[in-house]
């Protein structure tokens, strides 16, 4: 079995880096040893059940999802080689699922830190007023970057915002008082940058709709200028919106609607609560966790 692995690696030697070949060798050697321990000494006997057992054993051994996904990719490429060589008639690895990668969510900005950041005075120029309106709208509505840059002036009225999210799903969002005030300031100055025929809500110095990269750069620059000691990007403001709202309201369904998530499970992952908050909620709500007054000794 090990000879077949070496032949496969040799066939890749002109196309793969030494590091990739070493990783493939480790992954395939681990599979060969697993099969040999099960009494299998021929690659022709490899089937989907054995692949699943091997991946399960590796998961039990503590391999991280990223490592499991890499290992599965190596096995699949080797199985394709076995099919081309006539040893297998199909790739059994292709019938298994890729291990799910954990979602690495941005840490929400502390509520007080974010309030100080948003309340920092600016110089009142059209660009500064525009930036303040963008910041307030990001945090007030939890918008995605693409949703904010796609906004037209006609998408807003005094207290409500119309957004077209992922999958062309429309939703309506309430606008907080601070964001309303910041938008009113921007409306008064927007005409100094935007032409009469420009529909975009947020425009740059040349009067055209702001692009994604321009907004990302402005947020990072504002964080530095205002002394926010953390990297700031649109998704982090969205996550802060969701986390702060959920911590205050405990209404997961409402947060799901505001974020524009199709599935509640997405919101549950996206808006994780800190452990202390969950523990406090448990202590207050669960009948066997509530603290009772000590018995009267008299």
UniProtKB/Swiss-Prot annotation:
Active site residues of this protein: 144, 166, 235, 238, 261, 270
Any one biological process term the GO annotation gives: chromosome segregation
GO MF terms, alphabetically ordered: DNA binding; tyrosine-based site-specific recombinase activity
Subcellular localization, as worded in the UniProt entry: Cytoplasm
PROSITE patterns, per the entry: CB, TYR_RECOMBINASE
The keyword DNA-binding appears for this protein: yes
Pfam name, any one: Phage_int_SAM_1
Record's keyword annotation contains DNA-binding: yes
HAMAP family according to UniProt: Recomb_XerC_XerD
PANTHER family to which the protein is assigned, alphabetical: PHAGE INTEGRASE-RELATED (PTHR30349), TYROSINE RECOMBINASE XERC (PTHR30349:SF81)
Subunit field text: Forms a cyclic heterotetrameric complex composed of two molecules of XerC and two molecules of XerD.
Family stated for the protein in its record: Belongs to the 'phage' integrase family. XerC subfamily.
Function of the protein: Site-specific tyrosine recombinase, which acts by catalyzing the cutting and rejoining of the recombining DNA molecules. The XerC-XerD complex is essential to convert dimers of the bacterial chromosome into monomers to permit their segregation at cell division. It also contributes to the segregational stability of plasmids.
Protein name: Tyrosine recombinase XerC
Species of origin: Chromohalobacter salexigens (strain ATCC BAA-138 / DSM 3043 / CIP 106854 / NCIMB 13768 / 1H11)
Gene name of the encoded protein: xerC
